[in-house]
């Protein structure tokens, strides 16, 4: 069974709803889940915020965070995931985010091609969030990297749900 089927099954059985906040993956995470029958019961909302203004305006990522750490950083990914959960109308209690670079900028500056930052955030019953983040590096063509990043983001949802924070209701 493909990971997206596993995630839909896991979220549905856990009674959880998911929000996505995507940059480099450009909606691939939400699209993978939406391809699974029954995903409407666990996929709440998906944001694609590619630009700094989109990350700030829709997800509440602070300009100072983007300037200090760069757009491809765990700090930005964390604020994206937490911002998705805080967005008006969002009823999700789990969010996954991705920001990264799929190909080289060519100037030798910034993170290497394939660098992807992720965050997974859980809204607790008391309103607080617990958030985990990682950085990974994938190889391949631009779209192979984006696909790998989307699959990786999905593959870690159940892992992080088992840690002490998300289990605390």
Please name every model-derived segment.
Residues 1-169:
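Short alpha-helical segments enriched in small residues
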């Amino acid at each position: 069974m493909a990971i997206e089927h596993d995630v839909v099954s896991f979220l549905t059985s856990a009674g959880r709803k998911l929000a996505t906040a995507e940059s480099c993956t450009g909606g691939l995470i939400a699209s993978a889940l939406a391809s699974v029958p029954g995903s409407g019961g666990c996929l709440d909302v998906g944001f694609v915020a590619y630009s700094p203004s989109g990350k700030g305006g829709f997800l509440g990522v602070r300009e100072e965070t983007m300037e200090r750490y760069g757009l491809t950083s765990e700090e930005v990914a964390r604020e994206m995931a937490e911002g998705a959960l805080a967005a008006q109308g969002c009823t999700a209690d789990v969010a996954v985010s991705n920001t990264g670079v799929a190909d080289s900028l060519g100037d030798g500056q910034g993170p290497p091609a394939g660098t992807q930052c992720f965050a997974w955030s859980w809204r607790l019953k008391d309103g607080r969030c617990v958030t985990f983040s990682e950085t990974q590096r994938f190889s391949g063509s631009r779209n192979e990297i984006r696909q790998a990043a989307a699959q990786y983001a999905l593959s870690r949802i159940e892992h992080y749900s088992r840690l002490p924070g998300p289990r605390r209701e």
